[in-house]
Structure formats: structure tokens, C-alpha cells
């Protein structure tokens, strides 16, 4: 199994874990703040307007835009018009041919673009078929009005640019230029997609993480993975208890819920686990151990002949000494074994303990 960690701050060699072929450190780097993509990707073309400048990487070219001139005065000498606008061409008149239909122009007015002449009805947008006047766009031997030209040649190109952007390593969707991202080695993720592959919890800034075969893992699940693989590779290695250290905010949530209900049901355990970022099994073990400590404390209190009154809102740490002159104190970090939370088929190898 090929496993990688991002810029590990603390490392442990394979020999320290087991005699297996694992060659990766077991703690990942602290996760940095997300960044806003800018010059790494193509610009978003959806905000283009007809009047504004168009980026150089689009297909719009100023040479596609032409002015339409209505010609008549210069040709009046070649025609004789009756009061009812019937046309009579003089014998020495210059023959004007429509570039579009290749027929002679005998109208009172005709249109001229860059030296090319057209009937008024012949010069129209190839998409919406509206007559063109003042401005038109000519591309690939086709005339367009302003709106159709930008919809056909600029907006479609903008969509292509967005589709060619980088893909999120998690959801495989395109990352837009305005998306917030996180980076891990050569992988780029949407901010919301940067989550543990096992517990699906979104990783926060400053949190440690690991990369294993392209999959993101939080610190807890990466350690479980290392322990499981070590157990499979060496059945004769000695087993040592692994203890989990709870953060202060996790303890605060656990203690608050313990004060309300020391024996929560499955739904409450899942809710608490989600709030603390712990697994349901680890949360359940914490409550079991806390109830046991509380029961032991009550039994000891009843045997003290009532010499002191102490609060019974929650369990105390086994490492704490009784103090009759103060209320019961709660530790800022309580360690609880997660040995029971790991499947029986996994044998924990080595000595993995972290603060």
C-alpha cells in the first residue's frame, strides 16, 4: 500500500511502528488556510459585454466588426427616378452588383461594407435574419448582428474555457476561477470537498491530515489505518494500548451532554460524535468510562461519612486526587482508550501515542 503524508511535522520510522514495509510518517502537516484561485486558471468569461473589452484568449477580433454605410447620393447620377420611385437606369450608368446575390442593384438605396455592395434585403443576420444597419459582424463568410455574434462566438468560447479548467480531486467537477480551494501535494480540492474519506468530516484550517493513495484522511482515521496494516503484517508483535487525547473543546461538548444525560441513546451519541468530530464508538466508550468513574466516586463519597459535600454533575479523571475544600475539577484533557472501538480483526502494533 502506497501512503503519503503532506509535509509531516512529526515523523515515525517504519521500524518504530513494526517490521512491516510501511515507510510513511504517521502525522500530516497542519492544514493551511484556503486560497482563492486567480491566475492559476483561465478567467471566467461569463461577464463579457458587447461594449466592454474582450479578453485576448477569446475568439472575438475587432477585424470581425464592420461599419455599414447606406449609399445613395454617390449613385444618384447613375439613375433617374420617377415620382413614383420607379427606377430607370441611364445607358452610361455604372452597374452595381450585390455581393450576396450577385444580381444587379437597381434600388434607390443600397448598403456598402468595406467596398462591397449589397441589397438592403440581402444584408441580414444569418442567425436571427434581422436586417443589419450601422454595425455588423462578418466571420467565416457569414454576417451576424451584434447580439448573435457574441452569443455564437464569445459566450460559447467562454463555456469551453470553463470546461477546460482544473478538476476537483474529490468531486471531479471543474474548479472555477472564483472558487475557494485547498491544495494537497499535486491535488486541488473545492473548499467543501476537502474532507476525510472515512468520516466525511470537512477538515478545518490548522488541522492535521494525511494523503493515502490520493484519499484524504483525518489524523484519527489515518492512525487507525496504520495500526490495522501493522497488525496484518506482523501477527507476533506485542500489542500496546493506544490512548486518545481529547481536545478542550471536545471535552467541553462531551461534559455538557454528560451533565444532561449520562447514558445517551444511539441517536444522541451520533449527534455528539458529529459535533466533536469523533467516531460514535469512541464517544460511546467515553460515556461508559465516565459513568464508571462517576459510580466509583459516588461509592467513595458515601463511605467518607459525609465529611465533605461535592458536586456530582460529572465524572472526575482517575488521575485527579480528592479535594474536600473545593468542587470537583474536570481535566482539560482526558484520555480514553479506543481499543474497544477498533474491530477485533485488527491487531494494534507498536507504540503510537500522541498529544
UniProtKB/Swiss-Prot annotation:
It is found in: Nucleus. Residues 239-298 bind DNA. Expressed in the AWB sensory neurons and in one RME motor neuron (RMEV), two RMD motor neurons (RMDL and RMDR), the RID, RIV, SAA and SIA interneurons and the SMB sensory/inter/motor neurons. Residues 96-155, 166-228 form the LIM zinc-binding domain. Its main location: nucleus. GO terms for cellular component: nucleus. Residues 291-336 are annotated as: Disordered. Residues 306-326 have a biased composition (Low complexity). One of its GO terms (biological process) is regulation of neuron differentiation. One of its GO terms (molecular function) is RNA polymerase II transcription regulatory region sequence-specific DNA binding. It holds the Pfam family LIM. InterPro entries: HD (IPR001356), Homeodomain-like_sf (IPR009057), LIM_Homeobox_TF (IPR050453), Znf_LIM (IPR001781). Keywords: DNA-binding, Homeobox, LIM domain, Metal-binding, Nucleus, Repeat, Transcription, Transcription regulation, Zinc. PANTHER family: LIM/HOMEOBOX PROTEIN LHX, LIM_HOMEOBOX PROTEIN AWH. Interacts with transcription factor sox-2. Transcription factor that binds to the promoter of target genes. Regulates genes involved in serotonin synthesis and release in serotonergic ADF neurons. Involved in specification of neuron cell fate, olfactory receptor expression, locomotion, and foraging behavior. Required in AWB olfactory neurons to repress AWC cell fate and promote the AWB cell fate during early development. This is LIM/homeobox protein lim-4. It comes from Caenorhabditis elegans. The gene is lim-4.
Amino acid at each position: 500500500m502506497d501512503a503519503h503524508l503532506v509535509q509531516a511535522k512529526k515523523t515515525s520510522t517504519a521500524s518504530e511502528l513494526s517490521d512491516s514495509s510501511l515507510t510513511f510518517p504517521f502525522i500530516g502537516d497542519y492544514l493551511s488556510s484556503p486560497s482563492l484561485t486567480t491566475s492559476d486558471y483561465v478567467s471566467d468569461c461569463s461577464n463579457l459585454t458587447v461594449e466592454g473589452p474582450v479578453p485576448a484568449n477569446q475568439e472575438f477580433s475587432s477585424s470581425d466588426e464592420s461599419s455599414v454605410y447606406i449609399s445613395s447620393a454617390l449613385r444618384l447620377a447613375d439613375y433617374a427616378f420617377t415620382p413614383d420611385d420607379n427606377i430607370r437606369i441611364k445607358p452610361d450608368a455604372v452597374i452595381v452588383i450585390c455581393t450576396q446575390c450577385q444580381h444587379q442593384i437597381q434600388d434607390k438605396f443600397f448598403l456598402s461594407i468595406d467596398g462591397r455592395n449589397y441589397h438592403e434585403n440581402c444584408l441580414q443576420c444569418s442567425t436571427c435574419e434581422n436586417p443589419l444597419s450601422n454595425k455588423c459582424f462578418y466571420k467565416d463568410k457569414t454576417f451576424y448582428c451584434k447580439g448573435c455574434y457574441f452569443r455564437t462566438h464569445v459566450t460559447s468560447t467562454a463555456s469551453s474555457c470553463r470546461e477546460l479548467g482544473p478538476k476537483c480531486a474529490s468531486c471531479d467537477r471543474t474548479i472555477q476561477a472564483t472558487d475557494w480551494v485547498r491544495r494537497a501535494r499535486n491535488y486541488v480540492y473545492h473548499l467543501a470537498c476537502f474532507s476525510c474519506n472515512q468520516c466525511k468530516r470537512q477538515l478545518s484550517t490548522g488541522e492535521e491530515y494525511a494523503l493515502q493513495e490520493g484519499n484524504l484522511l483525518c489524523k484519527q482515521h489515518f492512525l487507525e489505518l496504520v495500526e490495522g496494516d501493522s497488525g496484518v503484517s506482523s501477527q507476533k508483535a506485542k500489542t500496546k494500548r493506544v490512548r486518545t487525547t481529547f481536545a478542550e473543546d471536545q471535552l467541553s461538548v462531551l461534559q455538557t451532554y454528560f451533565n444532561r444525560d449520562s447514558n445517551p441513546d444511539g441517536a444522541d451519541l451520533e449527534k455528539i460524535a458529529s459535533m466533536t468530530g469523533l467516531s460514535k464508538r469512541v464517544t460511546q466508550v467515553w460515556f461508559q468510562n465516565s459513568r464508571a468513574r462517576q459510580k466509583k466516586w459516588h461509592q467513595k463519597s458515601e463511605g467518607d461519612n459525609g465529611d465533605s459535600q461535592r458536586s456530582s454533575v460529572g465524572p472526575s479523571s482517575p488521575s485527579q486526587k480528592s479535594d474536600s475544600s473545593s468542587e470537583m475539577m474536570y481535566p482539560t484533557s482526558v484520555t480514553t482508550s479506543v481499543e474497544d472501538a477498533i474491530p477485533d480483526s485488527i491487531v494494534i502494533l507498536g507504540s503510537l501515542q500522541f498529544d
